[in-house]
Swiss-Prot record:
Protein role: Transcription factor. Binds to consensus iroquois binding site (IBS) motifs 5'-ACANNTGT-3' or 5'-ACANNNTGT-3' in regulatory elements of target genes. Required, together with irx7, for hyoid joint formation; they act cell autonomously to repress expression of cartilage matrix genes, such as collagen col2a1a, within immature chondrocytes of the joint interzone. May compete with or modify Sox9a activity, thereby reducing Sox9a-mediated activation of col2a1a. Probably acts in the developing hyoid joint downstream of Bmp signaling. In concert with irx6a, plays a role in visual performance.
Region of interest called Disordered, as start-end residue ranges on this chain: 175-312
Protein name in UniProt: Iroquois homeobox protein 5a
PANTHER family on file: IROQUOIS-CLASS HOMEODOMAIN PROTEIN IRX, IROQUOIS-CLASS HOMEODOMAIN PROTEIN IRX-5
A single GO BP: regulation of chondrocyte differentiation
Annotated region of DNA binding: 117-173
Originating gene: irx5a
Top-level lineage group: Eukaryota
Molecular functions per Gene Ontology: DNA-binding transcription factor activity, RNA polymerase II-specific; RNA polymerase II cis-regulatory region sequence-specific DNA binding
Family of this protein: Belongs to the TALE/IRO homeobox family.
Lineage per the UniProt record: Eukaryota, Metazoa, Chordata, Craniata, Vertebrata
Biased composition (Acidic residues): 184-201
Amino acid sequence: MAYPQGYLYQPSASLALYSCPAYSTSVISGPRTEELGRSSSGSAFAPYAGSTAFTSASPGYNSHLPYSADAAAAATFTSYVSSPYDHTTGMAGSIGYHPYAAPLGSYPYGDPAYRKNATRDATATLKAWLNEHRKNPYPTKGEKIMLAIITKMTLTQVSTWFANARRRLKKENKMTWTPRNRSEDEEEDENIDLEKNDDDEPNKPTDKGDSTDTEADHKLINPGEIPCDRFKDETHSKDLDPPLTDSELKEAEERTDLLAEQAKPTTSSPSVLQRGSDLITQEKPSEPGHAASTGNSNVTSVIHSPPSAPKPKLWSLAEIATSSDRCKGSSEASQAAGLSQSTVIASAASPTRSSPQCPLPNNTVLSRPIYYTSPFYPGYTNYSTFGHLHSSHGTNTSSTAHFNGLSQTVLNRAEALVRESKVRSQTQVDLCKDSPYELKKGMSNI
């Protein structure tokens, strides 16, 4: 607010009253001094610096109270702003002191009455209680609160003092009580004292008894017992497993294919996918033999794993059902690896659609299933169950008749890429040796 020069701004009486601190009503009610009026900054009721407020009883323009300077009259006017903890009206006015400590509750932090270090009187009280309760020096919550009030200490200080006292007596071999298991209250209280927890760590086994010591001795004497027991449990659980059926064998092979597919990038070119299939077919014959050797080392083999040379009936059935003239040059195992997965997931997705009805066999646009191979998303498995792209669900194996929306040129290009990748995969088997340049080249050709 800007006023013209020479204008005397006089605030109202309510503004002047509320501009003073809440605890300093003694300024109003106490006897006035000349220093207040002559101070360089004036008082809260002065319209300008160095005014003579409250120095005269005349109701002039510079006195904002309608009463005289009488203390009793001013006290009656300002009784509604006075504090119940304030001084009486007869006491001398003191501007700098405000009794903050009293109204803050029973445990006022920062109150000078509560010292940080315990006094002799406080420790004497606590020692007296400890001597009376030497058989059980664990005060309850109520007793701690009572002692805290008497000694003017906080509850934390009392708990810490008793924890330290018990530790001292324990070190001096003056324990006259039986150590007890810590209850919830004791855990709360003794966790405060960090020194006690550190010092008592070596002594804890003696409190718990000899059971932990004997267990530790047994562990030291026979260190190899634990892995042996674990090994026995594993072999026992293997004995209880029933022999697997053909469908379970199929699911086991599907899991190995899933693990191999997760290691690939989701946007790999068909050439990379074909190489991955060839790589997995080379590794796959060694897997059943490895499983058989590990099974025979423990117990008799539960999974009757077929030898690598003769293929079981399962592979040949899937191969005959979905093979075509174009894919006869490829190996049997590569077909079986891809087709067992597609037949399992297709049958899981739609039970009415059997495995011989896969319209796109292993040799078409993509030789391996990409992206998602779980039954939650069966449409991507070998492109075998894309119902919205199929014109019929018969056993026709032509690759281009079932794609209604795709152009013929794109399919021809993709087939040419597959043929290219078959030739290239014979020389390059290792997936890790593919350069990113070849990947980009394969993607750009599509």
